[in-house]
A protein has these predicted regions:
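PP2C/PPM-type serine/threonine phosphatase catalytic domain
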Residues: 1-245
Length: 245
């Protein structure tokens, strides 16, 4: 009989990077409630920072105060809609916040089950049996072109449109997130991150760091350090969650 997941452990780190004047990333986590969130804000002035913080705060508020009347994924989709509406309405009523938005990647766990939810190009990965796999699909112009076979990976990396995302929270009155259902096993290691990590580090490099099997806070620090060493062109956020027997 397969060993069941008994509990989870988590750690996170965020850093401004070496080029940006401020950090517009945000994250939230609650091991008790099985809720983990990373957001990467965008917009002029402090708008990106406001958008990402609003999204994280709303996701955490709603998903750590559930009454059990609905399924976890139903509550999560409602939380995404609420976060989107809050950012959108705030931007409509503040001229200096016009156009602000944020990406979102969320991991939800409940016993041995899990769900990843994403909007934008912040990613969710799973490491199982020493193999790293990207679970989410980037909502970005170049990644969608790659998936349709209209552009290869090298062309995507060189494209002037590589930073253009096709979905975000708060830029429209409604948004449709992608949802991925997971069956978790002891030893699974999940990574949620902003593109400040994945634009600097290729997946094999991330996999190599995670294979070091260090304490979670130390692995988060190693990931941030490696991204900064590679240039640190953007804010960097990583959140690790491990399923344990």
């Amino acid at each position: 009989m397969a060993t069941a997941v008994a509990h989870y452990a988590a750690a996170a780190a965020t850093d401004r990077g070496r080029k940006r004047p401020s950090n517009e990333d945000a994250f939230g986590l609650s091991v008790e409630h099985g809720v983990y969130v990373v957001c990467d804000g965008m917009g002029g002035a402090a708008a990106g920072e406001i958008a990402s913080s609003l999204a994280v705060d709303e996701m955490m508020r709603l998903l750590t105060s559930r009454d059990g009347a609905h399924t976890l994924i139903d509550d999560a989709e409602e939380a995404v809609a609420s976060a989107n509406a809050g950012i959108y309405l705030r931007a409509q009523h503040s001229h200096n916040l016009s156009g602000m938005g944020t990406t979102l990647v969320t991991l939800l766990v409940e016993d041995g089950r899990g769900w990843m939810i994403n909007v934008g190009d912040s990613r969710g990965y799973r490491m199982r049996n020493s193999r790293l796999e990207q679970i989410t699909l980037d909502h970005s112009l170049v990644e969608e072109q790659v998936r349709m076979g209209r552009m290869d990976r090298l062309e995507a990396q060189r494209s002037p449109f590589k930073n253009v995302i096709t979905r975000a929270l708060g830029t429209q009155s409604s948004v449709t997130p992608d949802v991925f259902e997971l069956e978790n096993e002891p030893g699974d290691l999940f990574l949620l991150c902003s593109d400040g990590l994945t634009r600097e580090l290729a997946d094999p490099t991330i996999e190599w760091i995670l294979k070091l099997d260090l304490p979670l806070p130390e692995m988060c620090a190693r990931l941030v350090e490696a991204a900064n060493d590679a240039g640190g062109h953007d804010n960097i956020t990583c959140l690790l969650v491990r399923a344990e027997a």
